[in-house]
Amino acid sequence: MVRVAAYVDGFNLYFGLKAKHGRKYLWLDLQGLVTSLLRPGQTLQQVTYFTARVRNDVDSEKRQSDYLDALAEHSPLVTVVDGRFQEKGRRCRQCGTTWTVREEKETDVNIAVALVEDAVQDRYDTALLLSADSDLCPAIRAMKRLRPDKRIVAAFPPRRQSGDLKQAVDAFLYIGDDKIRQSQLPLTVITAAGIVLNRPKHWT
C-alpha cells in the first residue's frame, strides 16, 4: 500500500471555502475529506492541519475551539499545528488614518518544515498538500532533492490554484464541491468527557 500523509493549509482552505460557499461547509471533516481524495492502493497515515488560534473575538474563538475539539474527537488521524497572529499597523495615504490589522504568521513555514522532515523520516510515500500557496514551492523542491523517491500531489481548495505549484508537484487536482458536501462532521459531536459540540449556527 502507498502511504499518504496530508498537509492542510487551514487559512487557504478556509478562505477558499468562504469564497465559494460562504460559511455553509466550514464544519469540515478533514480526515473524511482527505480519505475521499485517495486512490485505490493508497492508505492514509496522518492529516496535519495548520492554523492559528483566533484571539480578541469571543464568538469566533468559541466557534474555532468547538471545531478543533470536534475534529480531535471525530478524526483521530488529525493533528493540529498552531501558528500565530501578528498585529501590524496600517495607514491611509490619503487621510492619514491609522489602524491595526492582524496577520496570520508561520503557517507556510510550519507546513514546509513538516513536509521535508516527514519525507526525510520516511513517514509517507506520497504527500497530499491541500493548499494553493506558491510560497511552498521551495520546500517542495527541497523535499524532492532530499527524497526523490517521494511524490507530492497538490489538492487545490475551491477558487484557489497556483501555476507555480502545478509546476513544482508531481500531480494536482481540484477539490470538488461534492467531496466537500459529503465530508461534513456530524451536526453534534460528543466527546469522551461528555461535552456536546454542535455545529455553530453561524456556519449555515
Regions found by a protein language model. Give the residues of each.
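Nuclease catalytic cores that cleave nucleic-acid phosphodiester bonds
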Residues: 79-204
